C-alpha cells in the first residue's frame, strides 16, 4: 500500500501496510515487502537505501535482515502447514526457507564484521 503525502512542499511516497498498521515495528513492513517481491540482497539493499533517505545505520539494516530471515522461516512453516492440509505452494515455500537460511548467514557475517571492527 502506498500513501502519497506532501512534506516541506515536496511530494513523497510512503510504503504502509494497513493490515498490521500500528501493531509492530515498521521495519517488518520493509522486510515483508522485500520477501513478497522476491528481492535478492542487492535489491533489498537498494530498497533500504531508497526508504531511508537520510541513511540507514548498520543496526537497523541488520534488524531488517533479521526480520527477513524470521519472516522467511514463518512463511516457509506456514506453507508446510498448509501442504499438510492439501494446499501446495510449490517453489514459494522453498524460496521463503532460502530467505531464512541465506539471511541468517548474512546476519552472522555482518555481526562478525562489527565484532572485528570493535562495534559490538
Give, region by region, the residue ranges found by the protein language model.
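ATP/Mg2+ or Mg2+-diphosphate-binding catalytic cores
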Residues: 77-120
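Start-of-helix signal in alpha-solenoid helical-repeat scaffolds, especially tetratricopeptide repeats
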Residues: 62, 66-70
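An alpha-helical support segment within catalytic cores of ATP-dependent transferases
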Residues: 5-10, 49, 56, 102-103, ...
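Secondary-structure boundary motif
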Residues: 7-8, 53, 85, 109
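Active-site activation/catalytic loop segments of kinase-like enzymes and analogous catalytic loops
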Residues: 26-56, 69-87
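Conserved short-loop catalytic and cofactor-binding motifs
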Residues: 18, 35, 64
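Short amphipathic alpha-helical segments and their helix-coil junctions
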Residues: 44-63, 100-109
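Active-site acidic catalytic loop and adjacent metal/ATP-binding pocket
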Residues: 1-30
Amino acid at each position: 500500500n502506498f500513501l502519497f503525502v506532501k512534506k516541506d512542499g515536496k511530494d513523497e511516497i510512503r510504503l504502509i501496510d494497513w493490515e498490521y498498521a500500528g501493531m509492530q515495528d515498521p521495519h517488518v513492513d520493509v522486510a515483508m515487502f522485500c520477501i513478497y517481491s522476491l528481492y535478492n540482497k542487492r535489491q533489498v539493499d537498494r530498497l533500504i537505501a531508497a526508504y531511508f533517505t537520510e541513511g540507514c545505520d548498520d543496526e537497523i539494516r541488520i534488524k531488517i535482515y533479521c526480520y527477513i530471515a524470521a519472516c522467511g522461516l514463518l512463511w516457509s512453516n506456514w506453507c508446510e502447514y498448509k501442504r499438510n492440509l492439501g494446499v501446495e505452494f510449490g517453489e514459494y515455500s522453498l524460496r521463503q526457507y532460502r530467505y531464512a537460511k541465506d539471511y541468517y548467514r548474512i546476519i552472522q557475517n555482518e555481526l562478525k564484521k562489527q565484532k572485528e571492527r570493535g562495534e559490538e
